[in-house]
Amino acid sequence: MLTVEVYEMSKKIDIKFKLTIQEKIEIFNIIKNYRTVRSSLIEILKFVQKSYGWISNELITELACILKISKCDIEEIATFYSQIFRQPIGRNIIKYCDSVVCYVNGCEKIRCSLEKNLNVNVGETTKDFKFTLLPICCLGNCDKSPTIMINDDLYSNVTEYSVIVLLESYQ
């Protein structure tokens, strides 16, 4: 999705991109645990993302200003790590394991079922912002594969049919 489209979409869902004083205080508390500001960036981005759901261009600009580092430095970290989201994501994050073991045990059928029922491709978010579908290389549950995680809930031995029931429980 183009950045301009994402920005326009975010305006429609009325997201405010301004850090509160309390959030700024917490950011400086995070920095205290690190030797440099740059080394604290991942934790800062995770903290900000927890509040806003994703890291917008406006938040990067504001962080650069208060941390006195370049936007490029922040963008570099934000785009490198797959768990830092640079566009709006769904209320429910679905991660399907695509490791070798899950692949052998049918993760492709799971992926196809999820894509069909959500009407999205991998890496996309549903139009109603209920779900985002992401691959993950291993959920550490290989003996019970295929496995998916929805938010913090792990589901084992899933089938292309059982994922449909799971989706309904998160509506």
Curated annotation (Swiss-Prot):
Q: Which Pfam families match?
A: 2Fe-2S_thioredx
Q: Keywords on this record?
A: 2Fe-2S, Iron, Iron-sulfur, Metal-binding, NAD, Quinone, Translocase
Comment on bound cofactor: Binds 1 [2Fe-2S] cluster.
* Needed co-factor(s): [2Fe-2S] cluster
Q: Is Translocase one of the keywords?
A: yes
Per the UniProt entry, the Enzyme Commission number(s) are: 7.1.1.-
Q: What is this protein called?
A: NADH-quinone oxidoreductase subunit E
PANTHER family, sorted? NADH DEHYDROGENASE [UBIQUINONE] FLAVOPROTEIN 2, MITOCHONDRIAL (PTHR10371:SF3), NADH DEHYDROGENASE UBIQUINONE FLAVOPROTEIN 2, MITOCHONDRIAL (PTHR10371)
Look up the domain of life of the source: Bacteria
Q: Which InterPro entries match?
A: NuoE-like, NuoE_dom, NuoE_N, Thioredoxin-like_sf
Family under the similarity heading: Belongs to the complex I 24 kDa subunit family.
Q: How does it assemble?
A: Composed of 13 different subunits. Subunits NuoCD, E, F, and G constitute the peripheral sector of the complex.
**What's its job?**
NDH-1 shuttles electrons from NADH, via FMN and iron-sulfur (Fe-S) centers, to quinones in the respiratory chain. Couples the redox reaction to proton translocation (for every two electrons transferred, four hydrogen ions are translocated across the cytoplasmic membrane), and thus conserves the redox energy in a proton gradient.
Q: Where does [2Fe-2S] cluster bind?
A: 97, 102, 138, 142
* Catalysed reaction, written as an equation: a quinone + NADH + 5 H(+)(in) = a quinol + NAD(+) + 4 H(+)(out)
Keyword Methyltransferase among record annotations: no
Q: Which NCBIfam families match?
A: nuoE_fam, PRK07539.1-2
MF-aspect GO terms:
2 iron, 2 sulfur cluster binding; metal ion binding; NADH dehydrogenase activity; quinone binding
